[in-house]
Amino acid sequence: MDGDAGSLAWIPEHAGLVFAAGSREKNSPKHATAGQAILERLIRSKTGAPVRDVRGIASIVGCHHGKSPSSFDVRSAKEEHPTSMGFDNDTWQSVQEELFGFCLDLAGIALEDLGGLARDGVVPQAASVLSGLLIMCDWIASNTYAFPLVLLDAYEIESFEGSYSYDGSYEDRALLDSGNEGIPFELFRGRAQKGWDRVNILPSWSESLSVVDSCKDLYKSRFAFPEGALLRPVQEEALSVALAVDEPGLMIIEAPMGEGKTEAALAVAEVFAAKTGAGGVCVALPTMATTDAMFSRVHSWLERLLPASGVQSGTVYLAHGKAQLNEEYQGIISENRYHMGDMDHDGEKDSFAEVSDWMFGSKKGMLSSFVVCTVDQVLMGALQMKHLALRQLSLANKVVVIDECHAYGVTPTTCICGSILMLS
């Protein structure tokens, strides 16, 4: 266990899981490493797959703190700390196996399928995205606002028909904490749903090609073009190509200044998102100044795009070091907080764009559906750094627009190529 967990140790001890001497040593493996070591052992024992095959799956758990444990750390956890792992205690092993089977049942995965997956191997890109998703789940589950560390209220249990009557007494507390079978699993589903509602993560944006009638209509409905304005050739051609391709990939739009490349890129991004099922758009620029200017244009685009897509709101994030000084962005944040705290408002807002309370900050902000950022935020998806998996998760479901891509030096260009390779 990490740190001093003595305050919570009574819970497993009451259920019969004794902490043997030496199981709480200061040099014991961190729980991410322990989780990978235990999962490797369980998959091997249940499927017979060799350790080199199961590691691809188990490492998804191992790197949920942002950094993958080394092979030496995992081997050391197994060989030098069997007591901390529970490997020399039948009761602990039984609980680990039961929890392992329970998770497989929830996921609907048969042991035969798990063994086949281990032998076939997990594609690294998929493993990284799954690791990022696990990090996200871990942070949500660790959120004490969403899941407060208090006794379950009586109404949470009594709200289910024929459920166990819980009054908060010590006997009931012991019964609940021991995992008594009389307590319905729906109770914990309800607790999870309440926590999810408190976190209030909006669904990702989705687009349909049915909203695109023609090139002219799309540009007219998404951008504030003057009456009678004609499309630039590059705008019409870019959207025509986007509509024609079956499998969107990389598009390079090259034209002189003032030809409407930004509008063309956003229109193409909408079509690409509809064809690939992407849930957002990321627009990256070279400087904070250009990023601030672009944010205003993207915000204006979103106010037309989101209602046309049939969604009530979409999450937006401005990612650079001085985003707190952008008045338009801060205005969106202030409006969100006003409507959250105003009990008298009628539910209608002036803006369709929202800044998520949870998807906010240097690590989680990029998870928002729509992101306007300096290009380094995208480049970090191709660099070896902590929480790389979370960064790749945030980019994996987006159409990424890199503006002014000709303006970068050798090193950024190399990183851009790596980012494009990752996104492909």
Language model regions located:
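Pre-Walker A (Motif I) flank of P-loop NTPase domains
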Residues: 246-253, 278-280, 367-369
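Walker A/P-loop
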Residues: 247-269, 404, 408
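SF2 helicase catalytic motif II
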Residues: 388-416, 420-422
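Accessory nucleic-acid engagement/destabilization modules that flank
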Residues: 1-213
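Walker A/P-loop NTP-binding motif
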Residues: 262-279, 297, 419-422
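Conserved pre-motif I regulatory segment
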Residues: 214-254
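Conserved Walker A/P-loop ATP-binding site and its immediately adjacent core
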Residues: 279-303, 317-327
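Inter-Walker segment of RecA-like/P-loop motor cores
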Residues: 307-384
